[in-house]
């Protein structure tokens, strides 16, 4: 039952999919944290895997960069493969001065400069929010592990190289915690097709201060976030 962008067989994906942007990061998650791993799709080298974590079946697949790519894969996973829970895991740039590099942000809502949710909502503004049950599961997992998290709005940008740095002042004033490129689209797709979605990201760099994590710090923080998210996923 291959789709135009996924060549997995029926039943290849678990109900819960971790959804990093980078397909090689998906491979890393599968090989590092899952057992009994099987690669289930590789169209356009957008790799997807299914395995088990602490006995529960879990999948992980790359989404690509940006809302259009993420929305394509999310739609096909939900509509054609019966995926119920999509959890974006990745990195972001911090906006707020009280957010630090290596912090973990849970995107309770996603602002955006994209028009995609207006298109699906007949020209009106749609509140792109995370699913409460998924968000609560990750928050509880963070409490158990003692992981410091921030919960609030992220901004899903269409442009990586923004021509309007003054927009950062507006974002900070409005309490936006970090900038990434997918969550608003993912949340819109999930709402449209009756699935559940969440965005969990680590702060790899600070847009206002210029501070950045080293590659070693980035990997350690990312690993901690993945374990926290997987421990939440097995409770769903």
Curated annotation (Swiss-Prot):
Homohexamer; trimer of homodimers. It is an enzyme of class 2 (transferase). One of its GO terms (biological process) is purine nucleoside catabolic process. The lineage of its organism: Bacteria, Pseudomonadati, Pseudomonadota, Gammaproteobacteria, Alteromonadales. Its EC number is 2.4.2.1. Catalyzes the reversible phosphorolytic breakdown of the N-glycosidic bond in the beta-(deoxy)ribonucleoside molecules, with the formation of the corresponding free purine bases and pentose-1-phosphate. PANTHER family: PURINE NUCLEOSIDE PHOSPHORYLASE DEOD-TYPE, URIDINE PHOSPHORYLASE. GO terms for molecular function: purine-nucleoside phosphorylase activity. This is Purine nucleoside phosphorylase DeoD-type 2. SUPFAM superfamilies: Purine and uridine phosphorylases. Keywords: Glycosyltransferase, Transferase. The keyword Acyltransferase does not apply. Phosphate binds at residues 21, 25, 44, 88-91. Gene3D superfamilies: Nucleoside phosphorylase domain (3.40.50.1580). The record marks 218 as: Important for catalytic activity. It catalyses: a purine D-ribonucleoside + phosphate = a purine nucleobase + alpha-D-ribose 1-phosphate; a purine 2'-deoxy-D-ribonucleoside + phosphate = a purine nucleobase + 2-deoxy-alpha-D-ribose 1-phosphate. The active site is at 205 (proton donor).
């Amino acid at each position: 039952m291959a789709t135009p962008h996924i060549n997995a067989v029926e039943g290849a994906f678990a109900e819960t999919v971790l959804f990093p942007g980078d397909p090689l990061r998906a491979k890393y998650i599968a090989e590092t944290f899952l057992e009994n791993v099987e690669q289930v799709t590789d169209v356009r080298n957008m790799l997807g895997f299914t395995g088990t974590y602490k006995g529960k079946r879990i999948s992980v697949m790359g989404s690509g960069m940006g809302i259009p790519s993420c929305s394509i894969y999310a739609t096909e996973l939900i509509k054609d493969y019966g995926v119920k829970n999509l959890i974006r895991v990745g990195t972001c740039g911090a906006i707020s001065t009280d957010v630090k590099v290596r912090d973990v942000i849970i995107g309770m809502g996603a602002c955006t400069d994209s028009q995609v949710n207006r298109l699906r909502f007949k020209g009106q503004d749609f509140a792109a929010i995370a699913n409460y049950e998924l968000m609560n599961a990750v928050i509880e997992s963070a409490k158990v592990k003692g992981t410091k998290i921030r919960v609030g709005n992220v901004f899903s940008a269409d442009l990586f190289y923004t021509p309007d740095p003054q927009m950062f002042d507006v974002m900070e004033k409005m309490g936006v915690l970090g900038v990434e490129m997918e969550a608003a689209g993912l949340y819109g797709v999930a709402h449209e097709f009756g699935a559940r979605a969440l965005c969990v990201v680590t702060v790899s760099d600070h847009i206002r201060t210029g501070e950045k994590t080293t590659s070693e710090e980035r990997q350690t923080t990312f690993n901690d976030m993945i374990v926290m998210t997987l421990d939440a996923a097995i409770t769903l």
